Amino acid sequence: MLELSAKGQFAEDQAKTFKRLADMIRRTAEYKHVRVIGVTGSQFHNSGSTIVQELAFTLAAGHEYLVKLMDEGLTVDQVARKIRFQMAVSSNYFMEMAKFRAARMLWANIVEAYKPERQCSAKMFTHAETSRWNQTVYDPYINMLRGTTEAMSAAIAGIHSLEVVPFDAAFEKPTDFADRIARNVQLLLKHESHFDQVVDPAGGSYYIENLTDSIANEAWKLFREIEEKGGYTAAYESGFIVERVKASAAAKDKNIATRREILLGANQYPNFTEVAGKELTEAAVTRPVSEGNTLAPYRGSMAFEAMRLHVDRSGKAPKAFMLTCGSLAMARARAQFSCNFFACAGIKVIDNTFFKSIEEGVKAALESKAEIVVVCASDDDLSLIHISEPT
């Protein structure tokens, strides 16, 4: 199913694929811990889908494997116990806990509809991968914090295995240091926080239980909609799935552009003094274009990063001078907003605590030779300032 979303078509005839999978299941029947079918859901998340969409589309793909392989003469028990689900985990802390809990509940409902002989066949095996969509190439050490909170969400949610993406994976081959930190996050959660010692630690929490029910209900509605269209493959080939993901991605992009959704280090609180290193290439900040009915994973911060990299590599960094005057509290508040605004584009910021008069500020601004001067003051103070064009 992964190749369908990446290329828009299967690499080989579907009938041959499922016959081959059925043969693999029979050959590995005695190896109870070997799972030969991987259902990948992180592709949806990393392409901009919502949590509900990722869950519904992943379940639909898993159900299609179940049905097609049962048509090859296998029982529901034989197939279900060979499926491994892989989903992304974002920084939406409690929502991600609820997503994995909802996934287990819904998958159990799907499998039990086919009346398995063993109840354990309805158990979902889940692998989580920390988000690549929200990683940033500027101020990359923030990615360590993202990966840690995401790993914690997944562990509390009760996943079986976990991959923490190294903090520098977005722009280079991970260094030994980045790989070590990624591994140690899991070890710390296990050996120091003991998250592996409690079964469903989120169980009983009204907030998380309520979130779980809400996500499960919405995902089930979307799952049924996919089934009504003929199943995962039919829904995908009709463009239904790709259109839904692209619409969600567009909404996320708008929220990031307007800073309704915050990506630290990219569209809010950037490192003012950071300059892109040689390891950062234009390809790392260029959003891939999806061709036809395909999904193209990207990172939410790419638009800001591309703009900033262009400024960094231009040879001359423009400067923005903060001319703060009038009411101190409002002047500093607007200066902070303006500093963040310009720094997101890689423009060098010259911040100033406060000027006693507009004349003093103008003199300092002219001496700085900044290309941009931002007057930071309250609305009332701004109405008293007269700025004339140079003659």
Regions found by a protein language model. Give the residues of each.
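Long, amphipathic alpha-helical stalk/connector segments used for oligomerization, subunit docking
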Residues: 192-215, 219-220, 229
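Conserved phosphate/anionic-ligand binding catalytic regions in large, soluble enzymes, centered on
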Residues: 143-164, 168, 203-205, 231-235, ...
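Intrinsic disorder at enzyme termini
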Residues: 160, 221-318
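Generic long, charged, amphipathic alpha-helical segments
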Residues: 320-375
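Generic beta-strand/beta-sheet core signal
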Residues: 37-42, 86-90, 127-131, 147, ...
